[in-house]
Regions:
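Nucleotide-activated chemistry modules centered on ATP-dependent adenylation/adenylyltransferase
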Residues: 2-400
């Protein structure tokens, strides 16, 4: 009788390394799959493949879904200026969903009996993986050895060593999740709510030779098409270029306190130069190209979109409806946003757009008006005051 097949969502870390070896030893045919949303280098992927086979995997595959991640989610996060708590660009949470979808597809393609991942029982990722697998691969068993057996790091390392696999799984002071849309940093001083991270905890440091630099990001219908005049057809390449520029000034560092899906509070530090610069540039351009109510309702919808992504609700049927609204809102978001970069900070400067509503011939704010007379203005003010005059006419003694 043939062995059962299991696809392991393989990152190369301790938990998934243990999972591959343990399931192999237990008689499973293990298919290791690394879903890459832009966070792995070519060298890291090569090492992952080598280690997967050393651990006993029957097969290994890299599932590159970086561009799919952009087309199906990341661009909508830009359209919606999504920052959780007006701070965190929900990098890890949004990427996990697409990693899980890729793993589920792979499991169905090879006819797997089970899917395994290395999440613990403490965080959000267990929900994102399990929920996606339950929906995308119904009937396929979900295996989570680290969570279900409450394994310690020492137990996993000892098991690997006993079976001839040795790697540097030394518990570092900080843990990092690196992605195309930012790097999250956990551990160390972050566990103390009164402390921030020291300089050495960050992966990116100030390396720019100039004290300040100008960054110009050009958008067409809300999508990046050029950086400092250099055109980009590949949106991922454009994001990487902005990250390279912004990271040289160590821009995008911050710390977010938020609510986990389960309901407890959590604190995470991050560095995200590209997301911070892109979102603020995009927001700046929208201020000049969208109407007041377009901005208002898009802010509400963008917040909902980000919350649903974080809460593992990407597959909720309302999400394509939200994406359609966000896409429609971008039809006039064209032009170049100008930013000024300095070490550890940046500021918005201005925009150059053919759809700039501040260029209206009807008038200039605080200057001359051409679309109405003084009497028109007085009439508008009087009519606009009607609800207040009615209320305070009925309640003349009510004070504010």
């Amino acid at each position: 009788m043939a062995n059962k097949k299991v696809v392991v969502a393989f990152s190369g870390g301790l938990d998934t390394s243990y999972t591959v070896m343990k399931l192999t030893q237990d008689g499973w045919d293990v298919y290791a799959a690394c879903a890459n949303t832009g966070g792995f280098s070519a060298e890291q992927l090569k090492t992952n493949e080598e280690n997967a086979y050393k651990l006993g995997a029957k097969a290994y595959v890299t599932l590159d879904v970086t561009h799919e991640y952009y087309e199906k989610s990341l661009k909508y996060m830009i359209f919606g200026n999504v920052l959780r708590n007006n701070c965190y660009p929900i990098s890890v949470s949004s990427e996990r969903i697409f990693q899980a979808i890729a793993i589920a597809r792979d499991a169905k393609e090879i006819g797997a009996d089970a899917i395994a991942h290395g999440s613990t029982g403490a965080g959000n990722d267990q929900i994102r993986f399990d929920m996606t697998f339950l929906v995308m691969a119904p009937g396929v068993e979900i295996i989570t050895l680290t969570r279900d057996k409450a394994l310690s790091r020492k137990e996993e390392v000892d098991y690997l060593n006993e079976h001839g696999f040795f790697a540097d799984f030394t518990k570092l002071k900080y843990s990092y999740n690196v992605g195309i849309w930012g790097t999250s940093i956990c551990g160390g001083e972050i566990l103390d709510p009164t402390q921030g991270l020291p300089e050495e905890a960050y992966l990116k440091h100030v390396t720019a030779k100039e004290e300040e630099a100008e960054l110009k990001i050009t958008f067409e219908k809300g999508e990046i098409v050029a950086v400092n005049g250099e055109k980009f057809d590949d949106k991922i390449a454009a994001i990487q270029k902005i990250e390279e520029i912004g990271a040289s000034y160590a821009i995008g560092r911050d710390c977010n306190v938020g609510d986990t899906i389960i309901g407890i509070k959590g604190r995470v530090a991050f560095e995200a130069a590209a997301p911070k610069l892109i979102i603020e540039a995009h927001r700046l351009l929208e201020k000049s190209t969208l109407s007041k109510w377009q901005q208002y309702w898009k802010d509400q919808v963008g917040n909902w979109y980000g919350m649903f992504l974080h809460e593992s609700q990407y597959l909720e049927p309302v999400m394509p409806d939200i994406e359609a609204m966000l896409t429609s809102s971008q039809r006039n978001v064209n032009g170049t946003a100008i930013l000024k970069l300095r070490p550890l900070s940046f500021q918005t400067v201005g925009v150059d757009s053919p759809d700039d509503l501040t260029k209206s011939k009807l008038g200039e704010y605080g200057e001359m008006q051409h679309g109405w007379t003084a009497e028109d203005a007085k009439g508008f003010i009087k009519v606009s005051s009607t609800p207040l005059r009615v209320y305070y006419g009925m309640h003349p003694n009510e004070e504010r």
